[in-house]
């Protein structure tokens, strides 16, 4: 199963980068597969660590896609990284292995520590649709224009029916 998250990584100068990521999780391992080239890829190779943030706040996903990544964040204790101040929880992960691939290498990460901040309050179709729209926007170079417009048209139905004020 793919879980939509916000992954934060840092470069060697401790500048943080936030990216929306569909990660895979199995037991105590998390699999992160960034595209080549990407800042997440460069940072994971350089620092061998990341923070996986769990949130249903779609504004994080939208703002990452449009390049507005000035989020409220906190420094992790005893770990090189930052987590989103407003998330359900997060996991600090360390890269243990890299599976090479020409398009999307996979970083096999071990969970160092998990943190719970607040409770998840349930699923919302509008939020899921907005996250799906962000995924489409991040793949404009891979998908046809008509396919994207068709998908967005369908997704807008759930947003119109179930959105709150934030969506």
Q: What function would you assign to each model-found segment?
A:
Residues 1-90, 94-167:
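Basic, polyanion-binding surface patches
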């Amino acid at each position: 199963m793919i879980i939509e998250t916000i992954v934060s990584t840092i470069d060697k100068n401790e500048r943080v980068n936030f990216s929306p990521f569909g990660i895979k999780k199995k037991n105590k391992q998390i699999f992160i597969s960034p595209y080549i080239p990407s800042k997440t890829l460069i940072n994971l190779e350089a620092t061998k660590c990341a923070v996986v943030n769990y949130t249903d706040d779609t504004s994080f996903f939208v703002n990452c896609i449009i390049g507005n990544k000035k989020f409220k964040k906190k420094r992790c204790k005893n770990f090189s990284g930052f987590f989103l101040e407003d998330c359900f929880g997060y996991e600090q992960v360390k890269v243990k292995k890299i599976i090479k691939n020409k398009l999307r290498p996979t970083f096999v990460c071990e969970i160092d520590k998990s943190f719970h901040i607040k409770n998840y309050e349930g699923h919302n179709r509008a939020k899921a649709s907005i996250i799906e729209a962000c995924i489409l926007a991040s793949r404009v170079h891979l998908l046809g224009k008509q396919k994207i417009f068709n998908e967005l048209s369908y997704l807008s139905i759930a947003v119109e029916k179930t959105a709150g004020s934030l969506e």
